Amino acid sequence: MGTSSGSNLPHQMLPPRQQLQTSLSLVSSDPHLSRSNSGIVRESPAESASSQETWPTSKSIMGRKTDSGKTGPDSHDQHVIRHVSIADKVSLRDIARERLDIVAERMHRLPEEYLEELKNGLKAILEGNGAQPIDEFMFLQKFVQTRSDLTSKTLVRAHRVQLEVLVVINTGIQAFLHPNINLSQSSLIEIFVYKRCRNIACQNELPADGCPCEICANRKGFCNLCMCVICNKFDFAVNTCRWIGCDVCSHWTHTDCAIRDGEISMGVSPKSVSGMGEMLFKCRACNHTSELLGWVKDVFQHCAPNWDRESLMKELDFVSRIFRGSEDTRGRKLFWKCEELMEKIKGGLAEATAAKLILMFFQEIELDSPKSLESGEGGGTIAPQDACNRIAEVVKETLRKMEIVGEEKTRMYKKARMGLEECEREVEEKAKQVAELQMERQKKKQQIEEVERIVRLKQAEAEMFQLKANEAKVEAERLERIVKAKKEKTEEEYASNYLKLRLSEAEAEKEYLFEKIKEQESGGNGGEASQAVMYSKIREMLHGYNASSPRVDPRSNQRNPFRSNP
């Protein structure tokens, strides 16, 4: 393995994959730029698909299917497309299917804006945001990969944008369309025909380092410097236990892939003298095994001081998963130590302290390793003075470690004490706040009781006023009945008096008429017949009036007609 303990040259003791670049920004035309890694640990996407290869994710695909109403980049800048004749237009399908030279000739006549729109359309398909579904990309890729006319000789005649589109369709990496990525045409051709690594941060010729192994020779586009032997994907994670390097062939494998495919298991290392079993990694490229404990120790010694909290947690998780099935003592201890440190980090332990503890643990298990058995194999007895010196060294080392542990525990005790004091101060502040809240609550309670008392008083007043209103209403109804009765009685008395008055007037008129009639009868015996008839009629009428006693409306102001005609 590239970093295993004591098994390689000093330059091989560096952190894994340190020769790789770690970001696309490192690819530059400036030859003086360093190709060393940045030391930044990035998350490995080996569990699914490599995010750096920019395959469209299932989430973006589903977003494209559920958002079919959106228009893709082909609908933008229509004023540019309108100036291109139908015969000169070129689509992605034309590039994937038509003859290379014919499409190249048509593309030379197209404006730059149209070519940029063509590239944006391919980007949108890869991202799952285009007007066409991701199935269109698979369709295009099938066309390109089944063509036999696309060779290094014919691709020389291709248009620059045409070549970029073909490379993107073939590899599925849209970074080749990025404006800041300016690879030469020969490099693009070599990537297309699998003669150069498709990882823009690597760009090594294939097979890398002239490796004659079966995988490098037969697997198209595989680069043993940056790609996983199992999944054939790459990422930019460095200084990490996410990648395992082979001690013999220096091929790399994702730790996740190795665990998933059973390439990490118990076994006896060929370099072990004691013959004891330990956790080994079996390289799929060369079938050689490499021990893992020394490799993990070297990675932590070189890289752990630079890891942040999240990175340290992930690395401890990787080591824990690697040694979960370990049956040897040191492997089990390492597994338990990683589990313990992860719990402590979750509980608030600083990452620097955790890194120191794991490094101290590696020193302890190195002292506990069966070196005495291996060094004493076939040898004679140890001299007493040498034995005493070794014992003294062991005691000194033990005392030194005890002092370090004691200092660490003292520091942790002081930190815990400070935390306790801080908690006590917080408790006191919270108690004051609780007392204030209780006082405020009591005050609010008194205010509520006062308001409730006022409400009850107002309710009593309202009930009293309602009672008085009811009594007044009853009294008003009683007075109304009295007034009505008196009014009826008054009207009856008025009508009676009025009738009596009219009756007396009628009697007076009747007497007056009788007197007049008698005078007429006594004074004019020889009157005219008509006058006699008239008097007889008046007499009959008066008799009829006396007989019938007519009722007269007391409210009427009209007089008896006899009064107006005496």
From Swiss-Prot:
Keyword Transcription regulation: yes
Listed InterPro entries: OBE1-like_PHD (IPR047578), OBERON (IPR004082), Oberon-like_PHD (IPR032881), Oberon_cc (IPR032535), Znf_PHD (IPR001965)
Superkingdom: Eukaryota
Extent of Polar residues compositional bias: 1-10, 47-60, 555-566
GO cellular component labels: heterochromatin; nucleoplasm; nucleus; plastid
Tissue-by-tissue expression: Expressed in roots, seedlings, stems, leaves, flowers and siliques, especially in the vasculature.
GO MF annotations, alphabetized: identical protein binding; protein heterodimerization activity; protein homodimerization activity; zinc ion binding
Biased composition (Basic and acidic residues): 64-79
Keywords from the UniProt entry: Coiled coil, Developmental protein, Host-virus interaction, Metal-binding, Nucleus, Transcription, Transcription regulation, Zinc, Zinc-finger
Comp. bias regions, Low complexity: 18-29
Cellular compartment(s): Nucleus; Nucleus, Nucleoplasm
An individual GO BP term: regulation of gene expression
Induction line: By auxin in the root elongation zone.
Annotated region (Disordered), positions in chain: 1-79, 545-566
Coiled-coil blocks: 407-522
Deletion phenotype: No visible phenotype. When associated with OBE2 disruption, plants exhibit premature termination of the shoot meristem and impaired root apical meristem establishment, leading to a diminutive phenotype characterized by an absence of roots and defective development of the vasculature.
PHD-type zinc finger segments: 225-289
Keyword Zinc: yes
Subunit structure: Self-interacts. Interacts with OBE2, OBE3 and OBE4. Binds to VPg of pea seed borne mosaic virus (PSbMV), turnip mosaic virus (TuMV) and lettuce mosaic virus (LMV), but not with VPg of tobacco etch virus (TEV), cowpea mosaic virus (CPMV), tomato black ring virus (TBRV) and grapevine fan leaf virus (GFLV). Interacts with RBL.
Function recorded in the entry: Probable transcription factor that acts together with OBE2 for the maintenance and/or establishment of both the shoot and root meristems, probably by controlling the expression of the meristem genes such as WUS, PLT1 and PLT2 and of genes required for auxin responses. Promotes cell meristematic activity via the WUSCHEL-CLAVATA pathway. Involved in the development of the basal pole and in auxin-mediated root and vascular development in the embryo. Confers sensitivity to turnip mosaic virus (TuMV) probably by promoting viral movement and multiplication via interaction with TuMV VPg.
UniProt cross-references to PANTHER family, sorted A to Z: PROTEIN OBERON 1, VERNALIZATION-INSENSITIVE PROTEIN 3
Name used for this protein in its record: Protein OBERON 1
Species of origin: Arabidopsis thaliana
Biological classification of the source: Eukaryota, Viridiplantae, Streptophyta, Embryophyta, Tracheophyta
